[in-house]
Amino acid sequence: MQISVNEFLTPRHIDVQVVSPTRAKITLEPLERGFGHTLGNALRRILLSSMPGCAVVEAEIDGVLHEYSAIEGVQEDVIEILLNLKGLAIKLHGRDEVTLTLSKKGSGVVTAADIQLDHDVEIVNPDHVIANLASNGVLNMKLTVARGRGYEPADSRQSDEDESRSIGRLQLDSSFSPVRRIAYVVENARVEQRTNLDKLVIDLETNGTLDPEEAIRRAATILQQQLAAFVDLKGDSEPVVIEQEDEIDPILLRPVDDLELTVRSANCLKAENIYYIGDLIQRTEVELLKTPNLGKKSLTEIKDVLASRGLSLGMRLDNWPPASLKKDDKATA
């Protein structure tokens, strides 16, 4: 079948070579020239930075106040223990955060299998070494495991509440991604007479909490969802103008009675239909002096009260009165 030069090829052959339970090689071909790197790089970035997973985010070790401590009877120092905790491959079924405990004493190796698990928590690598104990060694820990995405440094989870947390709760930089290694190569491919096509080979290894094939599938789904917005992209022939009322300072909506003026001044203002502070500040001194029974003494009082609130006479409000201010409100003000 002859293929038009203007027609884009889509991959017809997908091969999955399972190297181990945690590693696979996925081959995708044929691809138009350049699309191997385009898709390979996009999938690689998503696999490394956007895949959800679980990791230890906090550890509390008996007798340890900070990460630069050493524990009697334990071969590793605290920093080494924390590094080993980062290697745990954990799955949470249902919850987003759990607290687990580990208690071990006496000579021997402390592994992930020594962690006491809840019914909805699974450790994929139970043989993972956490520490080595001497005959007098004792290791008691509380581990907080959380669900997340990508890489999250310890200080990004700290808040004002963390300042009051008990000393000895050690925060860990956490890599939630189940992907341990991802690499891709682009090789030459051929379809009929076209020899300048691409073949994408992805070599992917996970920590065992997620199957490599499923990881690729999820990464492709994320990419597809992000690009979906561009598929239906269309510009409006005429921009839609949404009329939005400018925000008004709440103090302007308060009645003039809140200014606590003298009875004489307040009655003079109401006689001129000045019910709200927003009504008042738009009047000038000349206008107010024309008000019956309102003299210079009352005017000075009004100016001083407005100044104490950062206001003055003669101000202009383009959006006054607001639509939310009903006429009935003035009658009851």
Swiss-Prot record:
Keyword field contains Nucleus: no
Cellular component, GO annotation: cytoplasm; DNA-directed RNA polymerase complex
Record keyword Transcription present: yes
Keywords: DNA-directed RNA polymerase, Nucleotidyltransferase, Transcription, Transferase
Source superkingdom: Bacteria
InterPro entries: DNA-dir_RNA_pol_insert, DNA-dir_RNA_pol_RpoA/D/Rpb3, DNA-dir_RpoA, RBP11-like, RNAP_asu_C, RNApol_insert_sf
GO molecular function: DNA binding; DNA-directed RNA polymerase activity; protein dimerization activity
Residue ranges of the region described as Alpha C-terminal domain (alpha-CTD): 248-333
Broad class of enzyme this protein falls into: transferase
GO BP annotations, alphabetical order: DNA-templated transcription
Signal sequence interval, chain numbering: none
Renumbered residue ranges of the record's region Alpha N-terminal domain (alpha-NTD): 1-234
SUPFAM superfamilies documented for this protein: C-terminal domain of RNA polymerase alpha subunit, Insert subdomain of RNA polymerase alpha subunit, RBP11-like subunits of RNA polymerase
EC number(s) given by UniProt: 2.7.7.6
Reactions catalysed, as given in the entry: RNA(n) + a ribonucleoside 5'-triphosphate = RNA(n+1) + diphosphate
Residue ranges that the Swiss-Prot or TrEMBL entry lists as coiled coil: none
Pfam family, one: RNA_pol_L
Role, per record: DNA-dependent RNA polymerase catalyzes the transcription of DNA into RNA using the four ribonucleoside triphosphates as substrates.
NCBIfam families, sorted: PRK05182.1-2, PRK05182.2-5, rpoA
Assembly information from the UniProt record: Homodimer. The RNAP catalytic core consists of 2 alpha, 1 beta, 1 beta' and 1 omega subunit. When a sigma factor is associated with the core the holoenzyme is formed, which can initiate transcription.
Record-stated family: Belongs to the RNA polymerase alpha chain family.
Domain comment, as recorded: The N-terminal domain is essential for RNAP assembly and basal transcription, whereas the C-terminal domain is involved in interaction with transcriptional regulators and with upstream promoter elements.
Protein name: DNA-directed RNA polymerase subunit alpha
